[in-house]
Amino acid sequence: KRIVDLSGNSDILSILGYQVIGTANSDAYDYTKFPSYLKDTLKGAKILGYSMQDTMDIEAVMNLEPDVIVISTVQEKMYEQLTKIAPTIMIQNEALDWKENIHHMAEIFQRTKQAETWLSAYETKAEKLSQSIKNKYGKDTSYLSFLASGGQFFVFSDAGFGDVLYNDLGLVKPKGMPKQSDISLPVVTYEGLAEIDADYIFLITTDEMQKELESN
């Protein structure tokens, strides 16, 4: 099938054995590029926007002549227009459990076996990595991950990379972490960051922002 994915789940579709022709899995800092970890996976796909945007280039979607279009509820207002181009599936992305998105997509595309195989391999890898990290850095060592953009700091608390760190790898969440209840990452100030007592930090940002933070 010729699949256009605007939902941000092009990586999941690749797990299920599909190569999308159009995607919105673009880099959060530069919508014209793929995230580095998806460059090979999405090679050849046309970037149509960013998955957290509620509108995309309708004409560009049409020119790809898709058989199926996948969107999330973020792009709900585009649904009627897109259905005139090709059958359109609208999904609700799970905010706090990315594995549920895999199960959901697998059910829609009838690829549950592929999903289970991938998740089983992932869990085995996560368990081994968890033990390796704890052996090297200690089982009580805490970790913070946040994204710095536009002078704001978005903390991965209970979803995304935070879910991987604290649930999949079983690493320690530092004291002072903000709570997260939906897809929006909690935003903190410089002072808020200082209140989070972490032993190690994973920083996601641009080179320019990193230099600014290091000089502060």
Question: Where are each of the predicted segments found?
Answer:
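Extracytoplasmic/secreted envelope proteins and their assembly/folding machinery
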Residues: 7-10, 14, 58, 76-79, ...
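A short, structured surface patch at a secondary-structure boundary
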Residues: 6-60
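Short hydrophobic segments within beta-strands
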Residues: 6, 23, 146, 203-204
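Extracytoplasmic substrate-binding proteins
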Residues: 81-150
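Solvent-exposed loop/turn segments at secondary-structure junctions
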Residues: 9-11, 26-29, 68, 75-77, ...
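Short secondary-structure boundary/hinge segments and terminal tails
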Residues: 30-32, 79, 99-100, 124, ...
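Binding-cleft/active-site segments that stabilize strongly anionic ligands or cofactors
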Residues: 37-90, 137-142, 154-216
